[in-house]
A protein has these predicted regions:
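Class I S-adenosyl-L-methionine
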Residues: 1-42, 46-162
């Protein structure tokens, strides 16, 4: 389930803040959703308030007993520690949304994706590098899931002629 999607860019179950998207299968706003057992993907708007609110909500959802929940999150590298670690411009700013996830007991794995790992924009018909990003896997149970499939896929994309 995509936690931040729209009817235009998803074919899976998705959450959207727009009431009209319910006609296309939206589950409604992520912030009103109760997570049940399953895999979720969160690629929120890159807005600090939204990402902090999302991080707090995800942690509270993962604290639920009886549900096996996995969540993959994509957020920008806006935290000073990572900016220094990866030799990026360090703006010296805290990034509470990332810190909540990074210090969580539910953190399974995180992966740094440099800015040159681009995404393909079908609207612009080209690859675009928006920001260096963190790919984070959270889980509330003993899982064997990892980000390995993403690591191997990124290597394929980088080494291709696309």
């Amino acid at each position: 389930t995509e936690l931040f999607g729209t009817s235009v860019n998803t074919s899976y179950k998705f959450c959207s803040p727009f009431e009209v998207d319910k006609k296309f299968g939206s589950l409604g706003s992520f912030f009103n959703l109760e997570l049940t057992s399953g895999m979720y993907v969160a690629n929120p708007p890159f807005n600090e308030k939204i990402m902090t609110k999302m991080s707090n909500m995800l942690i509270s959802q993962l604290e639920k007993k009886g549900e096996e929940i996995d969540i993959i999150i994509t957020i920008p590298v806006w935290d000073s520690v990572s900016q220094k670690k990866y030799n990026l411009t360090d703006y010296g700013m805290p990034f509470q949304g990332f810190e909540i996830l990074d210090t969580s007991d539910f953190l399974v794995e995180k992966l740094f994706l440099p800015k040159y790992y681009a995404y393909y924009s079908y609207y612009a018909d080209k690859f675009i590098s928006a920001s260096a990003t963190h790919l984070i896997l959270l889980s509330n149970y003993e899982t064997e899931k990892s980000l390995d499939v993403y690591k191997s896929r990124w290597k394929e994309v980088i080494n291709s002629d696309v």
